[in-house]
C-alpha cells in the first residue's frame, strides 16, 4: 500500500528544492590543486609514489627523475588529507604500508615498473590479493564506450572500456599518455575559455604514471575517491530530468510550435525541444547552390547560419518556447569548421587573422585564437538569440595535433567551461570522450538500430557507465533507424526511458518513423501517455538523487553490486539496476505472449524489505520472484519505508506544479515467496 500527500506550494516551500539541490562549483582545472599535500609523496630513485588515500596510490617512474605535478585531463586534484602510512626500506627497495594496502618496490637497474619490480597487496578479506605491475584484470566490471552508433544489442563498433571497479578487488588507470593543463606563471582572471589553464602535451622522456585503486568490493568508496581526485559529477539543471523531444526532420518553426500545442492538447509534459540539423542551411539547399564542404565532411551536416526558409525569425520562435517553459537545444557537427557561405565567416576570418581571400576556416579547436572565436563569433550570438545548450554530435576525427587529446573530450571541456564562465548552470550534450568526461554530464549514445536487442542492451550499458562516473547517458528512445517501429517495442522503450537518466525520444529522417505518442493506436497510446506523465512526476526524485550523485560520485542509475557487492545475484541480473536509493527497476525488454498478453520476468529482491509496485506485495530479500507482467506494467521494487518527493505532471517550467510526497510503509507481515 502507498500513501500520497499533495503539498500546497507556499512561498517558503517553493524555495526548498533549490536549497536542497544547489551544487557548489565542481573541481575544475582552474580550481584544482594538482600538487599533492606535503608528506603524501615518497621518492625512491627514478620513482615517486603518492599516497592519496589508504586505498589509492599514484605511482610514477621517470627516466630523468622529473615528475608531473600539473593536472592531467583525468586527474585534477591531488591535494587530499594525507592518510597514515609507513615507509620501510632496505638495500633492495622500499615498502609503503597503509591501513589497506602494502606496496613493495624493488627496482632493477632501469627502475621501471614491471611484474618483478612492483607489487601491491590488499589487506583484509578472506584471502590476500596481490597485484603485479602489468597484470591484466580479467574480472573488471567495465565502464562505457564512445558510441552505440549502428549497434543492435551488444554488437559495438568499439569495445567497452575498463571501469574503475573489479571483482578482482583492484583496478589500475594508466595516465601516462594523458595531456596536461598548463600552469600560469601568475594568477589569471578567467573571462574566456582560453584564459589560464590550456592543454599541453606530456613530456617525451620515457615515463610511467599509474593510479592503483585497491578498494576490494567497496565500489562506492572507489568512485567517491575517484571523484575527489578527478572532479565531481556535475548536477544537471532541473529541466534536464523532464521530457525531451528530438527528431531528425525538416521542421519549420510553425511545425515545432504546432507540435508543442499538440503536447498541451494531449495534457503531456515537455521540457526540452531539440532541433536537429535543419535549423541551419541543409544539404539540399547547399547542393542546389553547387557548394562543397571544403573540410571533406558531408555537406550540410554542420552550420551556424539559420535556415531562414524554416526559421524566418528564430529569436521570436525561441522566445515562444521559453514563454512556455521549454528549453532549446540545437545540433552541431563542429569538425567541419566554418565554410565560406556562413554568415559568420567574415568575422571568423578576421578573428583568425587569415587573408581576405580565404575560402574556408578549418576546425582548429586546440588553437587558442580559434577556440576564442569559436565561442565569441559562432556560439554566443546564437545563445543571445535564445539557444540554451548545444547537442554536439559526432566528431569525425579521434585525434588532434596534441598527442593523446581527443577532440570530443576537448570540446566537452570547452563548452562546459564556457557556460561556467557565463555564470550558467552548465549542460553538455555530447559523446563520451574518455576517462575524465564524467565532469561533462550528458552523453549522446548515438544512432542505434530499432530492435529488441538494442533495447535489451541499454539497461546494463547505462548502469555500467557508473563504473567510470558517467552518470547521464541519453539514448534515442525508440532507436534511430531504419524507420517504422513496432508499437509494442516503442512502448517498452519509453517505459525504460522513464527509468533512465535522461528521457529523450529520437529517430532518423523517415516519415514512417513515428515518435508522437498520440499517433499510436490503443492500448499503446494510453500506456505511452501514462509513461510520459510518470517521468514528469519523478523530476523531484531524480533531481534529489542527482544531487546525491554530485555529493558522492556514485551514479543514481547504477548496478546492483554497488549496494550488495557480496551477493552473487547482484552480478547476474543484467537487466535489473538501482534507480536512486529507493528503487530497483527491471524493464521489460521482450514482447508479450500474443495469446496471453503477458510476459514472464524474474526479479532479484535485494536484502531488506521491498514492495513490488505492480502487485503491491512486500518481499524480504535476498530472494528471487517470478511473475507475469502486462504491457502497462514495469517490474519495479520500492524500498519499504521510502519517502519519495514527486510532483504533478505539467509542461515546461512556466507553471508551478503541486508537490507530492509518496510514502511506501513497511509491512508487518512480510511476503517472502
Question: Where are these predicted regions, by residue range?
Answer:
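A low-complexity, Ser/Thr/Gly/Pro-enriched, surface-exposed linker/loop concept
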Residues: 27, 52-91
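Catalytic and substrate-binding clefts that recognize carbohydrates or anionic sugar/phosphate headgroups
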Residues: 89-237, 247-248, 260-265, 627-650, ...
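Boundary at the C-terminal end of the N-terminal hydrophobic targeting segment
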Residues: 21-23, 30
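Catalytic core of carbohydrate-active enzymes
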Residues: 416, 436-443, 457-461, 465-475, ...
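Aromatic-lined carbohydrate-binding/catalytic grooves of carbohydrate-active enzymes
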Residues: 234-399, 438
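Bacterial N-terminal signal peptides
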Residues: 9-18
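Alpha-amylase-like alpha-glycosidases and glucanotransferases acting on alpha-linked glucans and related
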Residues: 353-394, 423-451, 505-527
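Aromatic-lined carbohydrate-recognition surfaces of secreted/lumenal glycan-active proteins
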Residues: 241-247, 274-275, 326-339, 392-395, ...
Amino acid at each position: 500500500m502507498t500513501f500520497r500527500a499533495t503539498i500546497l506550494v507556499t512561498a517558503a516551500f517553493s524555495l526548498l528544492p533549490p536549497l536542497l539541490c544547489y551544487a557548489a562549483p565542481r573541481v575544475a582545472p582552474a580550481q584544482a590543486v594538482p600538487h599533492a599535500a606535503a608528506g603524501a609523496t615518497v621518492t625512491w630513485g627514478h620513482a615517486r609514489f603518492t599516497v592519496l588515500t589508504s586505498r589509492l596510490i599514484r605511482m610514477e617512474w621517470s627516466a630523468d627523475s622529473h615528475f608531473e605535478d600539473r593536472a592531467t585531463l583525468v586527474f585534477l586534484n591531488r591535494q587530499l588529507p594525507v592518510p597514515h602510512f609507513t615507509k620501510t626500506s632496505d638495500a633492495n627497495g622500499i615498502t609503503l604500508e597503509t591501513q589497506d594496502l602494502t606496496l613493495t618496490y624493488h627496482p632493477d637497474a632501469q627502475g621501471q615498473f614491471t611484474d618483478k619490480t612492483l607489487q601491491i597487496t590488499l589487506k583484509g578479506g578472506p584471502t590476500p590479493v596481490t597485484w603485479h605491475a602489468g597484470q591484466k584484470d580479467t574480472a573488471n566490471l567495465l565502464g562505457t564506450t564512445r558510441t552505440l552508433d549502428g549497434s543492435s544489442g551488444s554488437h559495438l563498433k568499439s569495445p567497452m572500456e575498463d571501469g574503475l571497479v573489479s571483482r578482482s578487488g583492484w583496478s589500475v588507470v594508466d595516465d601516462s599518455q594523458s595531456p596536461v593543463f598548463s600552469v600560469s606563471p601568475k594568477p589569471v582572471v578567467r573571462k574566456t575559455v582560453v584564459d589560464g589553464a590550456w592543454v599541453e602535451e606530456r613530456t617525451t622522456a620515457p615515463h610511467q604514471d599509474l593510479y592503483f585503486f585497491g578498494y576490494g568490493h567497496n565500489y562506492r568508496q572507489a568512485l567517491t575517491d575517484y571523484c575527489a581526485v578527478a572532479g565531481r559529477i556535475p548536477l544537471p539543471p532541473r529541466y534536464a530530468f523532464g521530457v525531451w523531444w528530438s527528431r531528425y526532420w525538416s521542421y519549420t518553426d510553425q511545425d515545432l510550435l504546432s507540435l508543442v500545442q499538440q503536447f498541451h492538447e494531449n495534457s503531456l509534459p515537455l521540457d526540452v525541444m531539440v532541433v536537429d540539423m535543419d535549423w541551419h542551411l541543409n544539404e539540399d539547399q547547399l547542393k542546389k547552390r553547387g557548394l562543397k564542404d571544403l573540410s571533406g565532411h558531408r555537406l550540410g551536416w554542420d552550420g551556424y547560419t539559420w535556415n531562414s526558409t524554416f526559421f524566418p525569425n528564430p529569436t521570436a520562435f525561441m522566445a515562444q518556447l521559453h514563454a512556455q517553459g521549454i528549453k532549446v537545444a540545437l545540433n552541431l557537427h563542429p569538425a567541419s569548421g566554418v565554410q565560406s557561405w556562413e554568415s559568420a565567416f567574415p568575422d571568423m576570418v578576421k578573428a583568425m587573422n587569415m587573408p581576405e581571400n580565404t575560402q574556408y576556416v578549418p576546425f582548429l579547436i586546440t588553437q587558442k585564437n580559434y577556440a576564442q572565436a569559436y565561442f565569441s563569433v559562432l556560439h554566443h550570438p546564437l545563445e543571445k538569440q535564445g539557444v540554451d545548450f548545444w547537442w554536439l554530435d559526432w566528431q569525425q576525427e579521434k585525434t588532434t595535433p596534441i598527442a593523446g587529446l581527443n577532440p570530443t573530450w576537448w570540446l566537452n571541456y570547452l563548452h562546459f567551461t564556457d557556460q561556467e564562465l557565463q555564470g550558467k548552470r552548465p549542460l553538455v550534450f555530447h559523446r563520451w570522450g574518455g576517462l575524465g568526461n564524467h565532469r561533462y554530464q550528458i552523453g549522446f549514445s548515438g544512432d542505434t538500430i530499432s530492435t529488441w536487442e538494442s533495447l535489451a542492451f541499454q539497461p546494463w550499458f547505462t548502469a555500467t557507465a557508473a563504473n567510470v562516473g558517467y552518470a547521464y547517458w541519453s539514448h534515442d528512445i525508440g532507436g534511430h533507424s531504419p524507420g517504422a517501429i513496432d508499437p509494442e517495442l516503442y512502448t517498452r522503450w519509453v517505459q525504460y526511458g522513464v527509468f533512465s537518466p535522461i528521457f529523450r525520444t529520437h529517430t532518423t529522417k523517415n516519415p514512417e518513423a513515428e515518435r508522437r505518442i498520440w499517433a499510436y493506436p490503443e492500448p499503446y497510446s494510453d500506456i505511452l501517455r501514462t509513461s510520459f506523465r510518470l517521468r514528469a512526476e519523478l523530476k523531484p526524485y531524480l533531481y534529489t538523487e542527482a544531487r546525491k550523485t554530485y555529493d558522492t560520485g556514485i551514479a543514481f542509475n547504477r548496478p546492483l553490486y554497488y549496494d550488495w557487492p557480496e551477493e552473487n545475484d547482484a552480478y547476474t541480473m543484467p537487466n535489473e539496476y538501482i534507480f536512486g536509493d529507493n528503487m530497483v527497476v527491471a524493464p521489460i525488454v521482450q514482447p508479450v505472449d500474443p495469446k496471453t498478453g503477458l510476459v514472464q520476468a524474474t526479479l532479484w529482491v535485494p536484502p531488506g524489505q521491498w514492495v513490488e509496485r505492480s502487485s503491491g506485495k512486500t518481499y524480504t530479500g535476498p530472494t528471487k520472484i517470478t511473475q507475469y507482467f502486462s504491457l502497462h506494467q514495469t517490474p519495479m521494487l520500492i524500498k519499504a519505508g521510502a519517502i519519495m518527493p514527486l510532483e504533478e505532471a505539467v509542461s515546461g517550467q512556466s507553471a508551478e506544479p503541486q508537490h507530492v510526497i509518496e510514502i511506501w510503509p513497511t509491512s508487518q507481515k512480510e511476503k517472502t515467496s
